[in-house]
Regions:
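Active-site recognition of the HExxH zinc-binding catalytic motif
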Residues: 70-82, 90
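Alpha-helical segment that forms one wall of the substrate-binding/catalytic cleft
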Residues: 87-98
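Classical Sec-dependent N-terminal signal peptides that target proteins to the secretory pathway
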Residues: 1-21
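Functionally constrained cores in energy, signaling, and assembly domains
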Residues: 7, 14, 69, 76, ...
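Alpha-helical scaffolds flanking conserved acidic
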Residues: 65-70, 88, 110-113
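C-terminal capping/extension segments of zinc metalloprotease domains
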Residues: 22-63, 82, 96-151
Length: 151
């Protein structure tokens, strides 16, 4: 599973020509560790480590094929931007996906949005409910990675 995720991340980063990630050649190490994610899909550290929960990712991938690509790139965004601001990183991730504009990237983004919309309880760090977070992601795709600042 780790090799598959690394390959997906590598391919995604190769596709994006105007990305911060490509320009700065920022590397990340993917590490399977469910305890480090504290129940989440994945989490990143500023020093370039992305911890992920393979069981959680497999469950999401089974129900929402392609969605995990969004979450891995999202964690990579924390490293690239050196930011813990979830809305900023969501916006960056959405915009990176919009730059890719491939069949696979569009499928992944749609799957992630569908997964995110299922969350009904508000989480302020992500901008509210799953519906509100999904709307932010959609707007960031359309308007760019700084969209979150004014909304």
């Amino acid at each position: 599973m780790a090799i598959k995720i690394f390959v997906i991340l590598f391919i995604m980063l190769k596709i994006v020509s105007t990305s911060y990630a490509i320009e700065d050649k920022i590397e990340a190490e993917l590490i399977a560790n469910c305890a480090a994610t504290q129940g989440g899909v994945a989490t990143a550290t500023p020093d370039g480590k992305i911890y992920y929960c393979a069981q959680r990712m497999a469950n999401i991938e089974w129900k929402y094929p392609g969605a995990v690509d969004y979450f891995i790139l999202h964690e990579y965004g924390h490293i690239v931007l050196q930011s813990g601001n979830e809305m900023q990183v969501d916006c960056w991730t959405a915009y990176e996906f919009s730059l890719m504009n491939t069949k696979k990237s569009n499928k992944s983004l749609k799957a992630a949005i569908k997964f995110i919309k299922a969350f009904k309880l508000p989480d302020p760090k992500y901008g509210g409910t799953g519906e509100e977070r999904a709307l932010l992601i959609e707007k960031c795709m359309e308007h760019g990675s700084d969209y979150y600042k004014n909304n």
